[in-house]
Each structure stands twice: as C-alpha cells, then as structure tokens.
Amino acid sequence: MVDNPFGAPVGDLIRELRHQRDLTQVSLAERLAEVSGNDGVNRRQVARWERGKRIPSRYWRNWIAVVLEIPGPRLDRAAAVAQFLRSASEAADDVEVGAR
C-alpha cells in the first residue's frame, strides 16, 4: 500500500475489505453481479481495480459499498486518492522525460 496523508487508494481499500470478509476476487465479482443485476463485472475487473489499473466508476463503487458494507463516501474518497496519485505519477513521468 502507498503511504500518503490522504488514505488508501480505492484498489488497496477494496482488497483489504475483501480479505477481511474472506471473499475471493471471483466471489466478490459474483456478489456484485448478483446485487446489481449487471453481469458486466468479473474477476479480471476486480483484479484491475485492486491493482490500480482501473478506478471503479461511481456505479460500481455504489455496489461495492453495498457488498463490502462500507459507506459510499469512503469509497469515493479512496477513488479520489487513486486518481490524484495516478495524476501525480503521470506528471512526474512527464517531468522525468522532459529532463532527459
């Protein structure tokens, strides 16, 4: 997990809460599909969220909050942290490339 003053990014939070509830990525995806009535989520999508490759949309964050029993605003904050860290990393990469 990345140490920062803003809290955990959404992927780290999802992984931590999933582990606390003894869910696999597959079982989380299945529960999300069941409660949302939308089978557009699978283990690969959950893995992408957890690795920070994708940030779950507000739609999925709402359902993740239901399944993992967490307040929606906490997930929204974690998504904002992930977006901030991603933007900061991209900016640092741009500066590094420009310095060459």
For each predicted feature, which ranges?
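A short, Lys/Arg-rich alpha-helix, primarily the initiator
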Residues: 1-26, 30-31, 62, 71-73
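Residue-level preference for nonpolar/small residues embedded in alpha-helices
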Residues: 10, 56-57
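Short N-terminal micro-motifs specific to bacterial/archaeal maturation
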Residues: 19-20, 37, 55, 66
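Recognition helix of helix-turn-helix/homeodomain-like DNA-binding domains
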Residues: 33-56
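DNA major-groove recognition helix of helix-turn-helix/homeodomain DNA-binding modules
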Residues: 57-75, 81
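Short, charged recognition helix plus adjacent turn
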Residues: 76-100
